Design a protein with these regions (language model features):
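Catalytic phosphate/metal-binding cores of nucleic-acid and nucleotide-processing enzymes, i.e., regions
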Residues: 1-79
Length: 79
């Protein structure tokens, strides 16, 4: 199973409605949008082993945080 699929299952088990943002109008936007009633929307950038966080992705994460959303990086550290 790909790491992103595992991340989706993890957040669904936590009660989130998870949307895979496959195509967006903004480059560098997070991979997943996780929604839960009564909580601030959570954007998750998924990084598998060997992937690196790009400067534009860091910029977009901060941009989302400045708008009041949560934005995190979920990095696979297992080898």
């Amino acid at each position: 199973m790909k790491y992103q699929a595992k991340v989706i299952k993890k957040y669904e088990k936590l009660g989130y409605y998870v949307i895979d943002l496959v195509v967006t109008n903004k480059k560098g936007i997070a991979d997943l949008l996780c929604l839960k009633k009564g909580e601030v929307p959570l954007f998750v950038e998924v990084k598998d082993i060997g992937d690196t966080i790009k400067p534009l992705q860091r910029y977009r994460a901060k941009e989302l945080q400045d708008l009041g959303f949560e934005s995190i990086f979920d990095i696979n550290k297992k080898r």
